[in-house]
């Protein structure tokens, strides 16, 4: 969970009131945080706050925490409003970045009066959002620049690796390739773009480099100080919805400091957008749902008042609450999310405990013990366990694996297209893991025990989640034989007889792939990964793998 530092005096300045340490321990709960540490430095008291929600980047700064507390205490109510004025600034996005880092969104914030506290909060929020919400800059990276040194229009373009600029913290020019090799941030994040045909650059009309997303800003424009009055913010990534949210978080935090937000027109080949877009989002919830699940006998107006203290605009109509909520949030996906806000505003400590009416005695699931035994065997074979997400997308499951698209369980309203479906097999997740770790030493030997979700029309839910085991070995020395040795050892330890029958599969090399049969029924597949699949994942060493269903191997 994200942890971040704030000064007590800065928080109190933003809230508009002073509180004791004991009061602060309770107040930060409204912002889904806990007070993790307190210390004094140079006569100032500092808090380390531990956020308990990875889906609320708007709460990872002094500005966000203070804003939430002001509303929770009733100092302000309803939907926060932020004015966005137009500017004449335009950013042109190069189509060549489509497979490099396709999306960039931008904003200007002027009228800033930064001091050491507000400057450190801005930089800390930038880093926390990119690190956690942006998955170590893979999905979101943020740049902040002194706009007085920028000459619009601005171009987000594909650059040759031999182009040069002076990166932040350096005095001499480096080529883009040299930055990845010599600069601290290039070494840390270079794997995100190293294998791309072009590198992304953000430049102004005079050719001055602002940044090399997602690696490093330039020394010329990327150094922001307490003297800076006007900043230009860029957010780049792979998902337009996600980078838009990150931009909204940044600009509204600065607006809490008195900054004035100005929009930027962003021109792509096929469309144009104006950013930031702070249009409130809509949701609707049944009031009886709130009462039923909370167990609280709340009147309609009481629910309305509680929601307004959590920054909603509320209109009551026909037993429903029609809601508007701020554009810096994107975590409201179900009525339960609204219920959570009601309970936070009500106060969990104010809910009276009840004695459970049903006594049960629990025991472990024997099949879970079987899965744990599988894990122990894999570790004993010298493999490292990984745990990846059940959520994925069709490109990962099919296109990158060189197989035709099939029907899978898709999410109706995904937060991100990256997480728009449930996986039907695990091996693509292992390939993605290997792709993300090409900078690490080989050989790499990994496995995962996890669920695959399949469509089953005979069931009430039309789906079934099946436990599976997937194994992948990456290294120049690995062949089909190495994967089969592990499968042989596994089956021998389990006392299961099996055979391999030659087959064809687009993810594997023809003639080096077979289906795994137990009692004549297909339970999995094993083989050497096809070169096209390796290329799709930017993996330069051979990979052998197998994936099997676990239930057919289970003997109670």
Swiss-Prot record:
UniProt xrefs under Pfam families: B3_4 (PF03483), B5 (PF03484), tRNA_synthFbeta (PF17759)
Compartments, as annotated in UniProt: Cytoplasm
Domain B5, chain residue ranges per copy: 278-353
EC number: 6.1.1.20
Transport listed as a keyword: no
Keywords: Aminoacyl-tRNA synthetase, ATP-binding, Cytoplasm, Ligase, Magnesium, Metal-binding, Nucleotide-binding, Protein biosynthesis
SMART domains with a match to the protein in the record: B3_4 (SM00873), B5 (SM00874)
Record GO biological process: phenylalanyl-tRNA aminoacylation
GO terms assigned for molecular function: ATP binding; magnesium ion binding; phenylalanine-tRNA ligase activity; RNA binding
Recorded GO CC terms: phenylalanine-tRNA ligase complex
Catalysed reactions, as listed in the record: tRNA(Phe) + L-phenylalanine + ATP = L-phenylalanyl-tRNA(Phe) + AMP + diphosphate + H(+)
Lineage: superkingdom: Archaea
Principal subcellular localization: cytoplasm
InterPro entries, per the entry: aa-tRNA-synth_II/BPL/LPL, B3/B4_tRNA-bd, DNA-bd_dom_put_sf, Phe-tRNA-ligase_IIc_bsu, Phe-tRNA-synth_IIc_bsu_arc_euk, Phe-tRNA_synthase-like_B3/B4, Phe_tRNA_ligase_beta2_arc, PheRS_beta_core
SUPFAM superfamilies for the chain: Class II aaRS and biotin synthetases, PheT/TilS domain, Putative DNA-binding domain
Cofactor: Mg(2+)
UniProt binding sites for Mg(2+): 331, 337, 340-341
Family indicated by similarity: Belongs to the phenylalanyl-tRNA synthetase beta subunit family. Type 2 subfamily.
Oligomeric form and interacting partners: Tetramer of two alpha and two beta subunits.
Name assigned to this protein: Phenylalanine--tRNA ligase beta subunit
């Amino acid at each position: 969970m994200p942890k971040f530092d704030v000064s007590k005096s800065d928080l109190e300045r933003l809230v508009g009131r002073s509180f004791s340490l004991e009061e602060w321990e309770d107040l930060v709960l409204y912002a889904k945080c806990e007070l993790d540490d307190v210390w004094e430095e140079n006569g100032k008291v500092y808090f380390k706050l531990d956020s308990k929600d990875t889906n609320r980047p708007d709460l990872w700064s002094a500005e966000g925490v203070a804003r939430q507390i002001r509303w929770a205490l009733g100092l302000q109510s309803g939907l926060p409003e932020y004015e966005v004025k137009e500017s004449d600034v335009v950013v042109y996005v190069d189509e060549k970045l489509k497979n490099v880092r396709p999306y960039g969104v931008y904003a200007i914030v002027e009228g800033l009066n930064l001091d050491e506290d507000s400057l450190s909060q801005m930089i800390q929020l930038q880093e926390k959002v990119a690190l956690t919400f942006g998955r170590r800059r893979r999905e979101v990276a943020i740049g902040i620049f002194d706009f007085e040194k920028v000459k619009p229009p601005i171009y987000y373009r594909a650059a040759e690796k031999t182009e040069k600029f002076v990166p932040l913290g350096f005095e001499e020019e480096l080529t883009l390739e040299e930055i990845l090799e010599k600069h601290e941030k290039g070494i840390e994040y270079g794997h995100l773009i190293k294998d791309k045909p072009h590198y992304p650059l953000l430049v102004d009309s005079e050719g001055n480099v602002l940044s090399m997303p997602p690696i490093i800003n330039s020394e010329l424009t990327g150094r922001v100080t307490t003297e800076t009055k006007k900043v230009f913010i860029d957010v780049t990534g792979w998902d337009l919805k996600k980078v838009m949210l990150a931009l909204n978080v940044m600009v509204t935090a600065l607006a809490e400091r008195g900054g004035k937000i100005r929009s930027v027109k962003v021109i792509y080949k096929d469309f144009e957008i104006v950013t930031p877009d702070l249009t409130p989002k809509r949701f609707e919830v049944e009031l009886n749902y709130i009462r039923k699940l909370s167990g609280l006998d709340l009147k309609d107006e009481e629910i309305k008042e509680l929601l307004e203290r959590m920054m909603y605009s509320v209109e009551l109509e026909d037993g429903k609450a029609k809601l508007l909520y701020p554009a810096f949030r994107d975590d409201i996906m179900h009525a339960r999310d609204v219920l959570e806000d009601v309970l936070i505003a009500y106060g969990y400590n104010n809910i009276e405990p009840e004695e459970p009416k049903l006594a049960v005695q629990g025991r472990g699931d024997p099949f879970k013990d079987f899965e744990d035994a599988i894990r122990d065997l894999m570790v004993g074979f010298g493999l490292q366990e990984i745990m990846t997400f059940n959520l994925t997308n069709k490109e990962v499951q099919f296109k990158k694996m060189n197989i035709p698209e099939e029907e899978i369980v898709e999410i109706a309203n995904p937060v991100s297209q990256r997480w728009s479906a449930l996986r039907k097999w695990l091996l693509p997740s292992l390939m993605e893991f290997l792709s993300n770790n090409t900078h690490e030493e080989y050989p790499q030997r990994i496995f995962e025990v996890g669920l695959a979700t399949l469509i089953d029309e005979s069931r009430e839910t039309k789906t079934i989640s099946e436990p599976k085991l997937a194994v992948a070995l990456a290294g120049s020395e690995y062949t089909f034989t190495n994967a089969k040795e592990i499968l042989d050892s596994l089956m021998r330890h389990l006392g299961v007889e099996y055979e391999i029958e030659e087959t064809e599969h687009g993810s594997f090399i023809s003639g080096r792939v077979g289906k795994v049969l137990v009692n004549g029924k297909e339970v999995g597949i094993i083989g050497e990964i096809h070169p096209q699949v390796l290329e799709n994942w930017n993996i330069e060493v051979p990979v052998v793998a197998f994936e099997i269903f676990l239930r057919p191997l289970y003997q109670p």
